[in-house]
């Protein structure tokens, strides 16, 4: 059971966005000539795959505060949901008092 299961909700509503798309690419086949008799064998090309991920995590409060600060001309991080300075305890693993 995680620490967050033990705490009653007391902070802003969580906001998360995640993207996970698999990428598969097959390369060209290879041809090999085996001696002494001239035989051509076709070997299938390798299949390469990866799973790039893009995730943004924050809260509705941090998004609202960022919007207010940007309207007032205060420079904010263009990365979006940055919680530094707006309650870094969201990264903590232990329960903080509400």
From Swiss-Prot:
UniProt keyword ATP-binding present: no
Keywords, sorted A to Z: Acetylation, Keratin
Modified residues (N-acetylserine): 2
A Pfam family matched in the record: Keratin
Family: Belongs to the avian keratin family.
PANTHER family referenced in this protein's UniProt entry, alphabetically: BETA-KERATIN-RELATED PROTEIN-RELATED
Complex and partners: The avian keratins (F-ker, S-ker, C-ker and B-ker) are a complex mixture of very similar polypeptides.
Protein name, as recorded: Feather beta keratin
Organism: Cathartes aura (Turkey vulture)
């Amino acid at each position: 059971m995680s620490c967050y299961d033990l705490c009653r909700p007391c902070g802003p509503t969580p906001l998360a966005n995640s993207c996970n798309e698999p990428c598969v690419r097959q390369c060209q086949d290879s041809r090999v000539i085996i001696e002494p008799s001239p035989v051509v064998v076709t070997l299938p090309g390798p299949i390469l795959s990866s799973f790039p991920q893009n995730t943004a995590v924050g809260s509705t409060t941090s998004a609202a505060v960022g919007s207010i600060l940007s309207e007032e001309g205060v420079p904010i991080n263009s990365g979006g949901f940055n919680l530094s300075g707006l309650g870094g305890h969201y990264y903590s693993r232990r329960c903080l008092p509400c």
